[in-house]
Amino acid sequence: MEGQNKSITFDGREIRLTTGLYAPQANGSVMIECGDTSLLVTATKTTKKEVSDFLPLICDYEEKLYAAGRIPGGFMRREGRPPERATLISRLIDRPMRPLFPSWMRDEIQIVASCLSLDERVPADILAVTGASIATLLGEIPFYGPMAAVRVGLIGDDFILNPSYREIEKGDLDIVVAGSKEGIVMIEAGANQLSEQDTIEAIDFGYEAVSELIKSQEDLLKDLGIKQVKPSEPEEDKTLPSFLEKNCTKPIELVLKKFDLSKEERDLELEKIKVETQGKIESLKDDNQLKVLLSENDKLLSSDFKKLTKKLMRSQIINDGKRVDGRDLDEVRKISASAGILPKRVHGSALFQRGLTQVLSTTTLGTPSDAQEMDDLNPSTEKTYLHHYNFPPYSVGETRPMRTPGRREIGHGALAERAIIPVLPGKETFPYVLRVVSEVLSSNGSTSMGSVCGSTLSLLDAGVPLKAPVSGTAMGLIKEGKEVRILTDIQGIEDFLGDMDFKVAGTDKGITALQMDMKITGLPVSIISDAIKKARPARLHILEKMQEAIEKPQETLSPHAPRLLSFRIDPELIGTVIGPGGRTIKGITERTNTKIDIEDGGIVTIASHDGAAAEEAQKIIEGLTRKVHEGEIFPGVVTRIIPIGAFVEILPGKEGMVHISQLSEARVERVEDVVRQGDEVTVRVREIDSRGRINLTLRGVGQNGGMSYPEPTPTPVAPLS
């Protein structure tokens, strides 16, 4: 077997491509490599037997732990359900690819990106997106490509192209920009309250790099002698569109101009027009061309009716500057917000509503042991902030089986999670693991941004000291030729019939998350810049409404939330606290009924529903780790007697021994003649031997229990900051 090897020099790195060797039965395949990261990306097209009204595109990213030299956990020692990370990368591939396939295409297309080797310096997701474009082009599948993606980071004042995992964690920006020759088709970003201008500059910087990769793909096709298959739309039968335009245009326009209609009322009136039109067609003679056409494809009427509705709604926005609910283009829907709506068994709760979109968010405070362990290829081993998004069928007035979360729910939850992370407090000041759940109770557009707003309110109600509140809004776009209209706070019908869904979240200081999806083949940076700038006043307006519900974190936590104490010990003394086989720390937890977590850096977190118990555990640990010095005097309790002396606990968990010769100035025959177990005595540290054992004495020390002794000298450690 022989393949063809090509390479692309990009940003000082070599991207290696191998074609014609792997997966020979796929329409197109490429092994794309950079550093030690290797992915096999395939594109396969099959003819769909059933007629549908959408493009059946499937994009899958799969990762196997052998790519990082690891064996899966669990009894089976085999990968199971795709982890959340794989689902998010699958969406990252799908979102820029989907708008670049022709809208009329109905063949099944599946793109599979398999991570075969992972280098922590080269994240696999960006290679997977670019590889999807290359595989599709090589497979000669109709496609408005090439398309490519890059990641942009920001460290200090410098943008970094395709940063490593460590650089991503270190920087203030993580943005993925995907584009075609026509412009940008997808953006996904998380940022540390970055200004709008800096964000726009990062997008521009990224698209310049995307253009280089697009040119490289065109050169690759020339080198391989492959001619790109440009989509050629089949000739459409105009019979039905002409009939609908003649019979339905005015009735639809009247409905779209009834600004006082609710979503349900508008949908019912449009459905009524469609049903009446269907009745007219059914009354035609059996040999009528239109009736024959619909008998062959019963979905055609709904499809073409939607197209006409879309055309008329867009025309109304372009020409009249009015939306279907009567709002101006930059107007936000009515907002209501409230916090603390559930009993305090739920640690924090809030209800956020914008128009007909309504989200209930709850916050649960957990202990460090509640952190989610990550069993995937991400270098991060655990998550301490979780956001779960649920979209039940009743939220859109439908009935269907309720399953496990799908890709959409996982993606929306991840976006809301990313928007909040930059404002969370450090674990040194607030060591709780946080889980927020957003339940979409009613949906009419922008539920993910409603979840961001609800999350903020819920976290504040739970007493989480956020650095700043976060709000979000979804921006839309109508583009007809050179005419462009940007819409603020889009609702469901505008999302469905528009060209862009651009979600922007942030604080009053700057942006924390972006997500842009297109339905056209690309937008210039200038239009995207305009949308970002117009989102800011909308976000600030929403923030004002949110702060009317709750302005700052609750001063006290729910009485049902665990109490945590966090402090630092010398990392070298961690073993002392844990003890042989974990006996010491187990004894402390059993004695105080607490949960104790110790990190490698020496941060100790104690969890308990009883604050006094947590403080007792802290005293024991501090006693174990406190250094004792010769000459110090302590009150203590005799814990046990042996023939040659007595053991005395001088600090919680720390004992020393008084040799029989040190019990008294006079000769002592039996230890029990002087002290017994449980006696309270005052002792002085005589010496600390080479093995760290503490030797004590009662000689020369008064036993009145009221004498003074030196204040404990704490072990010098770094402060918790």
UniProtKB/Swiss-Prot annotation:
Mg(2+) binds at residues 495, 501. It catalyses: RNA(n+1) + phosphate = RNA(n) + a ribonucleoside 5'-diphosphate. SMART domains: KH, S1. Its EC number is 2.7.7.8. InterPro entries: ExoRNase_PH_dom1, ExoRNase_PH_dom2, ExoRNase_PH_dom2_sf, KH_dom, KH_dom_type_1, KH_dom_type_1_sf, NA-bd_OB-fold, PNPase. One of its GO terms (biological process) is RNA processing. GO terms for cellular component: cytosol. It holds the Pfam family RNase_PH. Keywords: Cytoplasm, Magnesium, Metal-binding, Nucleotidyltransferase, RNA-binding, Transferase. SUPFAM superfamilies: Eukaryotic type KH-domain (KH-domain type I) (SSF54791), Nucleic acid-binding proteins (SSF50249), Ribonuclease PH domain 2-like (SSF55666), Ribosomal protein S5 domain 2-like (SSF54211). CDD domains: KH-I_PNPase, RNase_PH_PNPase_1, RNase_PH_PNPase_2, S1_PNPase. It is an enzyme of class 2 (transferase). Residues 631-699 form the S1 motif domain. Residues 562-621 form the KH domain. Belongs to the polyribonucleotide nucleotidyltransferase family. Involved in mRNA degradation. Catalyzes the phosphorolysis of single-stranded polyribonucleotides processively in the 3'- to 5'-direction. This is Polyribonucleotide nucleotidyltransferase. It comes from Prochlorococcus marinus (strain MIT 9301).
